[in-house]
Amino acid sequence: MAANSNSRVASNHTSKKQKVRRNIHPFTNNTRIKRASKIVKFNDSGEGDHVSDQRSNKENVLTYKSLKSRASDLLKMRETLPVYQHKREIMSYIESNPVTVLIGETGSGKSTQIPQFVLEKLYDTKKHGSIAVTQPRRVAAINLATRVAQEHGCKLGEQVGYSVRFDNTTTTRTRLKYLTDGMLLRELMMNSDLREYSVIVIDEAHERTVLTDLILGFLKSLIQGPRPDLRIIVMSATLQAEKFSEFFNNAPILFVEGRKFDVKQYYLKAPTDDIVDAVIRCCIQINQGEELGDILCFLPGQEEIDKAVTIMEKIAKYVSDEAPVPLIVPYPLYAALPAVQQSLVFAPIKGFKRKVVFSTNIAETSVTISGVKFVVDSGLRKVKVWRHQLGLATLLTVPISQASAMQRSGRAGRESEGKSFRLYCESDYVKLPKQSEPEIARSDVTSPVLMLKRYGVDDLLNWTWFENPGKEAIVMGLQELYELGALDTRGKITKRGQQMALLPLQPHLSSVLIKASEVGCLSQVIDIVSCLSVENLLLNPSPEERDEVNERRLSLCNAGKRYGDLIMLKELFDIYFYELGKSQDASSERNDWCKGLCISIRGFKNVIRVRDQLRVYCKRLFSSISEEDEESKKIGEDGELISKILKCFLTGFIKNTAIGMPDRSYRTVSTGEPISIHPSSMLFMNKSCPGIMYTEYVFTTKGYARNVSRIELSWLQEVVTNAAAVAKQKVSDSK
């Protein structure tokens, strides 16, 4: 691509494809920077850091001055960013085009600076309206908002804030809001034309999540209909931007080069079976043989990351005692991590130490960690693949794309020359797909279809999909919603469907909550749903601890032993929330209890946050959460209450059921496929269940049911009677 900032739009006689390719206005930074500016650590001010009314005016003035002084210092760093150096040209295109596509390579500063340029323009022209910046991940939304608030010289939640699922720091004063794509969709459900916003920025569009693709479709409808005044900026970290331009009628494409230093690539000579072990060994070798510099390790998921952190914590001191090498300090980084824990990753460490961050693909482009000189790439990621034939989501560990591999490697060359250690063979790298498959091509579209119905879209097949999921996927989504009671026989959204669309949950769990509100066990079901909403709440014990930990869990969960994992989660929640929360030393007591049962301490804190928010939502929707005393909310061993709770879950997960066979195996009700109870389940050794229900399906060497509960066949018949008749109908025929 030419590095000429004066290039112009292609002439009209070129073909459409050529026009798009040449309609790229590149801004390059030819000045070599000896050392990139350090990223100032993100403050942990995301927990409602507001100026108290009780503080004196003097304190407020001092706070204001310190914020502005900080912003002034950061401005010097901002001015060195490639994006900042082309501020005038970029803003010229944004102002004169309804849609602008901007390719900003990693390190260009697009995510922090472009929204601030637009905000300054709104101030200068005294225009009303706010700016929304979407992110595919909550951790990115939180960290970017925190950083930009610092650069803007304000407290988080004043002019700059964030809104993510179950956490919101915005106020009436907020003009620049970072939010997850899911939260913007939720705002669309409440305010169909998004009048609050003058500009909407879709960041990390190259990740092609289902929700991002859905937002692009909604935005195209808006600018072609009620909001021609709306300005849209689509930002991508990769060069594959032609599709975005074509979708928005050949919108101009701008290119800003990022800061890059050379990164040397290293590959394995032979494949490895144990990826966590290989990553640990690679980190130790780097620590023993390379100069100081932090290490960023990419692992497929939270489970592998927690395992790696645990192992590294155990061996780090021993390794540094054996040889004069830096002390390794390991940190996890994944989307489910609380904001306080996330902030530790970005803080510099003092002394003769080396930070090692174990991360999911969240660190590919969404966040920047200063000080990284080495990248260790497992070459793997976790994806959910929807199996239309089974009606189940399968969680798979799959190879990344070449584009992702390049993004990961680039993280080692942000501030200086670096090294990338790919834990796979070079011959395997060339076999990787060029780009990652769009999420919508492998996902269940039930939730997007519900949102479209809530929005008033009837012709789903011909809607302005950015990537049409196909007729089969759409019809199955419609059928699923019909069976859940969200749609009527004509495909119109029902009152139940309206309620489901407003809850920040998948439709199946929303259906469960609605049923619980009708039968009088909403508080208990909210507690269980909150536990299910947090990934990896129950950690996998080490092999030597497994039997002991399982015995402890079994001894505490008498009802769980009989009824399964959902009831077990409620029993554990009751102990954590009601019994351990009363003493003066509750925090320490809870931490010790979690460690003894191999339960995520961070996870349970997240559960409480999710629970609080769900109770707020449910009070608004149902007005039926009673303020009963604490003891009545606990589940105990009340068989009647437990049956009522499990029947509620059965209404949402009727397809996720299996019947016990004479040989003590299980076969799914919907397809007759064999399925096994996962070894981590409370019911793994229980061979006497007449039937089971599960909320998750995973496939390794065979199909496993997770979050398993015992059900009686009479319950199944009771709930299925109406659903079976509905399942035979083709929802598409009624449209």
Swiss-Prot record:
Q: What UniProt keywords apply to this chain's record, in alphabetical order?
A: ATP-binding, Helicase, Hydrolase, Nucleotide-binding, Nucleus, RNA-binding, rRNA processing
- Please state every residue range assigned to the domain named Helicase ATP-binding: 91-257
Q: Which residues form the Helicase C-terminal domain?
A: 262-456
InterPro entries per the UniProt record, alphabetical: DEAD-box_helicase_OB_fold (IPR011709), DEAD/DEAH_box_helicase_dom (IPR011545), DNA/RNA_helicase_DEAH_CS (IPR002464), HA2_WH (IPR048333), Helicase-assoc_dom (IPR007502), Helicase_ATP-bd (IPR014001), Helicase_C-like (IPR001650), P-loop_NTPase (IPR027417)
Localization recorded for this chain is: Nucleus, Nucleolus
For bias type Basic residues, the affected ranges are 14-24
Q: Which stretches of sequence are listed as region Disordered?
A: 1-29
UniProt entry tagged with the keyword Nucleotide-binding: yes
Single GO biological process annotation from the record: maturation of SSU-rRNA from tricistronic rRNA transcript (SSU-rRNA, 5.8S rRNA, LSU-rRNA)
The EC number on file is 3.6.4.13
Database matches in Gene3D superfamilies: 1.20.120.1080, P-loop containing nucleotide triphosphate hydrolases
A GO molecular function term, named singly, is: identical protein binding
Q: Which GO terms describe its cellular component?
A: nucleolus; nucleoplasm; small-subunit processome
Q: Could you say which residues bind ATP here? A: G104, E105, T106, G107, S108, G109, K110, S111
- Has the keyword rRNA processing been applied to this entry? yes
Q: Which Pfam families does the record match to this protein? A: DEAD, HA2_C, HA2_N, Helicase_C, OB_NTP_bind
Which reactions does this protein catalyse? Answer: ATP + H2O = ADP + phosphate + H(+)
Where is the motif DEAH box annotated in this sequence?
A: 203-206
Q: Which residues cross the membrane?
A: none
Write down the superkingdom of origin. Answer: Eukaryota
Give the chief site where it resides.
nucleus
- What more does the record tell us? Present with 721 molecules/cell in log phase SD medium.
Task: Provide the function of this protein.
Answer: Probable ATP-binding RNA helicase. Required for 18S rRNA synthesis.
Give the family per the record: Belongs to the DEAD box helicase family. DEAH subfamily.
Its quaternary structure? Interacts with NOP19. Interacts with UBP10.
Q: Please identify the protein, giving its name as recorded.
A: Probable ATP-dependent RNA helicase DHR2
Species name: Saccharomyces cerevisiae (strain ATCC 204508 / S288c)
